[in-house]
Amino acid sequence: MPEITVRAKSKTYPVYINEFALEDVREKWTESLAKFSHVFVLTDEHVAELHKAKLDAVLADLPVVTYYVAPNGEEAKTFRVYEDVMTKLIETGLDRKAVLIAFGGGVIGDLGGFVAATYMRGIPFYQVPTTVLAHDSAVGGKVAINHPLGKNMIGNFYQPEAVIYDTQFFATLPEREMRSGFAEMIKHALISDQTLLRALMDTFTEPKDFYTKDLTPFLQRGIEIKANIVAQDETEQGVRAYLNFGHTFGHALEAYGNFGKWLHGEAITYGMIYALTMSETIYGLDFDLAEFKTWLKQLGYDTTFDATVPFNKILENMRHDKKTTFNEISMVLLEEIGKPVIFKAEDDLIFETYKRVMRNGGNGI
């Protein structure tokens, strides 16, 4: 089975990925889990309904397993749900020898990791992602919940014991969720590898390809790209910020939509178009943005922007971005495909780019 090793400064751990990863690691994993005093599984309503039986079968021989089922979507990454999970942990009597399993998409991985990082100052946890999007969020140790004023504003860096990535779960993902996760695969290609981007564009040309083509080698490459960056910079003091390409504008848009109007990958797609447009202005980026947007449309993405989204709200949200320092908004731009840079953008440039993007496609968000 393909295995990728993540070598962060604080911990080294494996990422297991294939179509039957849960079954393939079952014996070794359950032996490890049996050493803990209690196994606590955090999942959401949708994953519990579809896939709980699969995880139950793997954990069947363990003496003590408790589930917490969170609401679906970004609603789970709130103070209210975080407090409720903590209450459940305390009432259940989990001690420091317990372990948490985050079983779900990126939201559950973020929430579960943050719960594990903060319960009794930290207990071990495993990531068992079930979505394409989670190939990015499950690796690297970023864990967080949202604040009404910004996405992932309350969080930590806390690495899992392992990531068990069973791609059989993708079969039940709606097309919109597949597309959202695929956006992060596009991001990894843009910041690292023109050849990878071309391979994605040649392989995936319509929505059904998400289900009929093999995503695994592309997911592996994306995880390898992220693992290499995390090995250099675990806590985002430097190059790890490159992984935020498209996220400064994207997170601002998510916040404007109250973390529900757009899925994460949908917002990041708009953010990547915005960042590519600014990269053309600042660095003369040699990139066929029109071809790129046409490809995105073929895959079902909406690439047009709605002029009714108020710039002042987006700018305010961008100021709350974690890369913003001394009130200067930091953008991840591209000098060329595979060559990201951090650029301090002034308000005038942010507005001019906003207007340019609107001119190139409006009334679509």
Swiss-Prot record:
Protein localization: Cytoplasm
InterPro entries: Dehydroquinate_synthase, DHQ_synth_AroB, DHQ_synth_fam, DHQS/DOIS_N, DHQS_C
This protein's UniProt keywords: Amino-acid biosynthesis, Aromatic amino acid biosynthesis, Cobalt, Cytoplasm, Lyase, Metal-binding, NAD, Nucleotide-binding, Zinc
Gene Ontology CC annotations of this record: cytoplasm
Binding site for NAD(+): 106-110, 130-131, 142, 151, 169-172
Binding site for Zn(2+): 184, 247, 264
UniProt pathway annotation: Metabolic intermediate biosynthesis; chorismate biosynthesis; chorismate from D-erythrose 4-phosphate and phosphoenolpyruvate: step 2/7
Cofactor: Co(2+); Zn(2+); NAD(+)
Superkingdom: Bacteria
Main subcellular location: cytoplasm
EC number(s) recorded for this UniProt protein: 4.2.3.4
Purpose: Catalyzes the conversion of 3-deoxy-D-arabino-heptulosonate 7-phosphate (DAHP) to dehydroquinate (DHQ).
Protein name from the UniProt record: 3-dehydroquinate synthase
Organism: Listeria monocytogenes serotype 4b (strain CLIP80459)
